[in-house]
Curated annotation (Swiss-Prot):
One of its GO terms (biological process) is chromatin remodeling. Its EC number is 3.6.4.12. Residues 1-20 are annotated as: Disordered. Coiled coil: none annotated. May form heterododecamers with RVB2. Component of the SWR1 chromatin remodeling complex, the INO80 chromatin remodeling complex, and of the R2TP complex. This is RuvB-like helicase 1. ATP binds at G73, P74, P75, A76, T77, G78, K79, T80. InterPro entries: AAA+_ATPase, P-loop_NTPase, RuvB-like, RuvB-like_C, RuvBL1/2_DNA/RNA_bd_dom, TIP49_P-loop.
Amino acid sequence: MVQITEVKENQSSRESRTAAHTHIKGLGLNEQGIAKPIEGGFVGQNEAREACGIIVDLIKSKKMSGKAVLIAGPPATGKTALALAISQELGPKVPFCPIVGSELYSAEVKKTSALMENFRRAIGLRIKETKEVYEGEVIELTPEEAENPLGGYGKTISHVIVGLKSAKGTKTLRLDPVIYESIQKERVTIGDVIYIEANTGAVKRVGRSDAYATEFDLEAEEYVPLPKGEVHKKKEIVQDVTLHDLDVANARPQGGQDVLSMMGQLLKPKKTEITDKLRTEVNKVVSKYIEQGVAELVPGVLFIDEVNMLDMEIFTYLNRALESSIAPIVVLASNRGLTTVRGSDDGVKAPHGCPPDLIDRLLIVRTLPYNQEEIKTIIGKRASLEGLTLTDDALEKLSKQGLTTSLRYAVQLLTPAGVLSTTAGRSEITVQDIEECEFLFLDSRRSTKVLQETKTFL
């Protein structure tokens, strides 16, 4: 007898990479909007989380459009995590566009144009369309031929007869030969479930009817049930696009298939800068759709991290962009106190690296440094997320290290310590592993001290 053994699926290969904010699942607020001490991957920062909860409510009720929020606080206090939690609370349907201040500087595109591009990435458009469709299982597929009008012995397809069956009956359709080409492209055969759009003639193969599911043992087919209702029905289709998608679609129209147009596309590798005129035209079309009730504007969130990297030109443009009729909610983050604004001639210091006229427009959310107990809880959560086990003494040692140096350094020591404990044949990370990691990897303060002592060389 031939031996057959079942291959067990390797679960470890499915696990996604553990990133810096993998553990963040939301703001962790209760029904009254009050922050729970440890919830949604957050520990502490109750006031900041509650403030962000109010911002989320304002965004959902569409009362926050064109306003800006600044999350300010020392490094490693969860500013980026708060912005990520806001995006998760809003859900996947609301556009969220995260960028870093230095991303706006490019040799090909102007700074202001790059900022406007990201502005429009953060504004969604929900288009609702009612389409007439014929949906059912194919029970007949007969092309009808006719004499070639151009002469000769060949024949052309004049039309195609398609029979469709649904739960409530059958219909036989006489379709144009162009639709027959679409049917051939989709490789439709009898027994497939398809739908045909009445207006455009687009054909979509949904899958194979589940009545044929037992025909073969090994198949890569997707079996679907027989469509409910009548063959001819009206379907409401909702599409979510951003204004930037519409800009790009209109900025790069599809050229012909001739050699000149193909050469033109090859010779133009540079990024296309979308003009203000094109954006204005797109805005007019969008406004028309909104007035007709066909589309709905969904203001999203533009998150700009390290806002102190922006210069005076961008800040001036940002002031104007926030006042425009179509603007998203802008969330800024800065870990600077009083610092010089880039591009200012007088070198005057401003709070958080933002000019005073922009600071007036911002709602400022403050994040505070973590205490030792909070650091201990965060390290414990990260360890469980990475599948590591620490002894109580090792956790205490790491939390003290996080308090004296930085939380990031303490969290970064976890994985190397896990490797050392596995190499030594231990199932738990001990104080010895932490001390060895501290010896092998310097933190910023010890590294600076070494440089000061050696002065001219490492």
